[in-house]
């Protein structure tokens, strides 16, 4: 009887994938790819507004011990007032900035290092789940190191991107505790500590992690792979490590007043609305409407997984989408079909399954995969689907890699033609090429989510020598709040001279949507008023020396064309400087 790892060898790729030592070479390749994309993004990339806000908080923590709103050591960051930001990502960036300096690449290093380290966790996890099945192990690792989302998120910091990497460590420690008797209590403890860290990595983990752990632990207990005392110990450790997060939940629910815990501030986020806007719990109306939304959520996610290049193809047609986080899925080309094939192989009744295509041989492997599938179904139904927010499901990408690896191994086992491994190698190369293509589009984008155009406009205004810089008020509240953040991010040398960010966001940001009163928005940026927001509706309103337009290109009459030098950046930001 043959296994996937002992199947007849059909060429260099098959031999390499079935070799035990290949994993180390794949990890080295993963490191090289991450470094290359990290450097490429520094050269050709940009700064996402969420990253800019994270760095603002990290800088403030490194300097003052408070976030950008003046709150000392918060458990979670009330960053946008209506939506929070990961404390794990922010505190790690703050530590690196404090130790190594205030540069964007330094703020990005913690996530890049975490992503790389997670490859070792993945290697250990696959060896525990698929012992002796080196083809499966190495294929999972290969699919992970060329994963578009991993390469993209290793290059810059989207705060929620820590969750998938933290979960890999949590699962490795947990499976090690289940499978190996040595130091079992220690590994259960490490596992629960990592699961707790996941709660501080992404607010949606408050749904994902409890659901996953309930299914996983019940399955392990039913299958007699875990003793009940270890389950109790795990609950206790998780509760202790997650206590600040749990206290935040009680404060947010109004069951507890604002408090401090071990030096951490736990305060209610009064305007927080993500729970309603990004989950099914915010669905209003009848039970039928809720059911329809649940079906839409699940259907949208499954379709996007089956056709993972959906956003990339849209970006190729509409360059304004370039840089969209969801351009970078769990895999390119036929990854969705391979994952579907792997799922069918996993679900196929055991009595009808061939030994050569039974890749999840151990009870623990089947429990882990099955638990993740169950958690995915619940999560995909509850969390609101949006094609441009597939990063919400990145925690399940390792599951998709495992299923896709089953599909790859099935092809290698079932077809003796040497064309099969060559085709698979070609698809891996195409995947990297497509990811590189998407990266290359950053130089052409014009989006309010990214700051390069605004940085250029602000630099031109500051270099003009004008004593005042007037920022033209936008009609879009989300453009306005992003401009407020980018101003403080790119003009860090003037941050002490600027007015507080919180009242500015309340007056100009998303919370001001629908308010027709313009006056509160026309406020000073600097304390001396030399930088301020103004309203420009007609050409005759242009009376000063220097203006910045964010998200719009002004139409100047002949008189103003002669009067002002126009500097246009990607048809998105414009600086007007009066000619000398």
Segment roles from a protein language model:
Residues 37, 53-91, 95, 270-281:
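Extracytosolic helix-loop segments that constitute the early lumenal/periplasmic catalytic or substrate-binding loops
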Residues 153-154, 207, 333-338, 366-415:
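Hydrophobic/aromatic-rich transmembrane helices and adjacent perimembrane loops
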Residues 141, 186-203, 240:
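Membrane-interface alpha helices of multi-pass inner-membrane proteins
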Residues 109-131, 169, 173, 341-347:
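Transmembrane-helix motifs of polytopic, lipid-linked glycan transferases
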Residues 54-60, 64, 209-341:
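Transmembrane-lumen/periplasm boundary regions of multi-pass, lipid-linked membrane glycan transferases
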Residues 193, 214, 239, 408-439:
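Signature aromatic-anchored transmembrane alpha helix within multi-pass, membrane-resident enzymes
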Residues 48, 149-162, 203:
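Short acidic/glycine- and proline-prone juxtamembrane loop motifs at membrane-interface regions
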Residues 204, 421-570:
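Catalytic lumenal/periplasmic loop and adjoining terminal transmembrane helix
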């Amino acid at each position: 009887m043959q296994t996937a790892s002992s199947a007849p060898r059909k060429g260099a790729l098959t031999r390499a994938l079935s070799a035990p030592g290949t994993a180390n070479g794949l990890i080295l390749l993963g490191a090289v790819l991450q470094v290359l994309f990290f450097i490429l993004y520094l050269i050709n990339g940009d700064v996402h507004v969420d990253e800019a806000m994270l760095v603002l908080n990290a800088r403030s923590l490194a300097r003052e011990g408070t976030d950008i709103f003046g709150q000392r050591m918060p458990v979670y960051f009330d960053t946008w007032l209506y939506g929070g930001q990961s404390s794990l990502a922010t505190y790690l960036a703050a530590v690196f900035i404090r130790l190594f300096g205030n540069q964007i690449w330094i703020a990005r290093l913690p996530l890049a290092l975490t992503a790389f380290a997670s490859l070792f966790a993945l290697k250990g996890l696959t060896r525990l789940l698929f012992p002796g099945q080196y083809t499966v192990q190495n294929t999972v690792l290969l699919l992970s190191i060329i994963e578009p989302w991993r390469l993209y998120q290793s290059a810059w910091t989207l705060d929620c991107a820590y969750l998938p990497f933290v979960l890999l460590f949590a699962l490795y420690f947990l499976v090690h505790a289940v499978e190996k008797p040595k130091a079992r209590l220690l590994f259960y403890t490490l596992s629960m500590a990592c699961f707790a860290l996941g709660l501080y990595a992404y607010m949606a983990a408050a749904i994902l992690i409890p659901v996953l752990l309930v299914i996983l632990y019940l399955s392990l207990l039913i299958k007699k792979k875990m003793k009940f005392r270890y389950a109790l110990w795990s609950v206790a450790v998780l509760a202790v490590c997650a206590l600040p997060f749990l206290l935040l939940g009680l404060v947010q629910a109004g069951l507890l007043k604002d408090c401090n815990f071990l030096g951490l501030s736990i305060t209610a986020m009064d305007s927080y609305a993500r729970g309603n806007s990004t989950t099914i719990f915010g669905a209003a109306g009848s039970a039928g409407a809720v059911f329809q939304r649940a079906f839409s959520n699940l259907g949208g996610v499954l379709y996007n997984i089956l056709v993972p290049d959906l956003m990339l193809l849209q970006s190729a047609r509409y360059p304004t989408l370039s840089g969209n986080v969801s351009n970078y899925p769990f895999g390119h080309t036929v990854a969705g079909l391979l994952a579907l094939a792997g799922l069918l192989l996993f679900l196929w009744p055991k009595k009808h399954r061939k030994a050569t295509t039974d890749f999840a041989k151990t009870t623990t492997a089947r429990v882990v995969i099955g638990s993740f599938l169950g958690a995915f179904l619940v999560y995909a139904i509850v969390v609101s689907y949006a094609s441009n927010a597939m990063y919400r499901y990145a925690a399940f990408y390792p599951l998709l890699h495992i299923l896709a690896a089953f599909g790859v191994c099935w092809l290698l086992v079932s077809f003796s033609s040497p064309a099969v491994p060559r085709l698979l190698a070609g698809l891996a190369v195409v995947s990297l090429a497509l990811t590189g293509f998407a990266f290359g589009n950053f130089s052409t984008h014009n989006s309010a989510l990214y700051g390069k155009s605004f940085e250029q406009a602000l630099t031109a205004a500051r270099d003009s020598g004008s004593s005042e810089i007037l920022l033209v008020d936008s009609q879009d509240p989300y453009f306005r709040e992003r401009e407020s953040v980018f101003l403080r991010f790119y003009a860090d040398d003037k941050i002490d001279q600027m007015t507080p960010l919180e009242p500015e966001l309340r007056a100009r940001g998303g919370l001001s949507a629908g308010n027709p009163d313009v006056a509160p928005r026309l406020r000073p940026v600097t304390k001396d008023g030399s930088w301020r927001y103004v309203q420009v509706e007609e050409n005759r309103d242009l009376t000063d020396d220097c203006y910045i337009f964010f998200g719009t290109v002004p139409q100047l009459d002949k008189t103003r064309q002669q009067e002002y030098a126009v500097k246009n950046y990607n048809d998105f930001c414009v600086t007007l400087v009066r000619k000398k």
